[in-house]
Design a protein with these regions (language model features):
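Aromatic-enriched hydrophobic runs in primary sequence
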Residues: 7-22, 153-158, 170, 174
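Polysaccharide-binding and catalytic clefts of secreted carbohydrate-active enzymes
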Residues: 31, 36-174
């Protein structure tokens, strides 16, 4: 990180760093080995046929907390070395998140969330009057599954970005 910042300064360039802690191009292949090896602490997403995927579930608080800790340490460091010169102008939080092989996660944690009522804040944002579970409000097709998964990915990334911005308030995007 320091070398990239120093080199950018020498060439009068600005930087947008990319953080891919939990996911990159849908997969969790760049997660640290201690995350990938501990599937009990960091469960994987499952297809509708219970096939495990190399995608950490967005429904794991353990994953979110570990991702936050590491991301916040990075943001502290960037602030310490760059808040005066502002070489780092933006941060991309995660990269191309989504599901492959299945429209949504069917892990036990995801299934529990799927059976819960759709959050009121989402219903309000979508200007929907209907209340109920995800299946009751959106149906049970692939598009409904994608809405469910997109909401929870967005919720995860929003929490991660907010934690980072609380440390060093630079623009962030997905």
């Amino acid at each position: 990180v320091d070398s990239v910042i120093t080199t950018a300064r020498k060439h009068d360039l600005k930087i947008v760093f990319l953080w891919f802690g939990a996911w990159k191009n849908s997969m969790s292949c760049y997660a640290p080995l201690w995350v990938k090896e501990n599937t009990k602490r960091f469960p994987r997403s499952l297809t509708e046929n219970s096939k495990p995927l190399e995608i950490c579930t967005a429904f794991s608080d353990n994953l979110l907390q570990a991702d936050k800790r590491a991301f916040c340490e990075l943001m502290k460091h960037i602030k310490a070395v760059d808040s005066q010169e502002n070489t780092v102008i933006m941060m991309q939080v995660e990269n191309e998140i989504g599901m492959l092989e299945s429209a949504r996660d069917h892990s036990p944690l995801a299934e529990k969330a799927y059976r819960q009522p759709v959050p009121a804040s989402l219903l309000k944002a979508l200007k929907l009057k209907k209340k109920g579970t995800w299946a009751e409000v959106f149906g049970t097709d692939r598009y409904a599954d994608e809405k469910f998964q997109a909401y929870y990915y967005a919720k995860y990334v929003e929490q991660l970005a907010s934690a980072g911005k609380a440390i060093y308030n630079i623009p962030m995007y997905v």
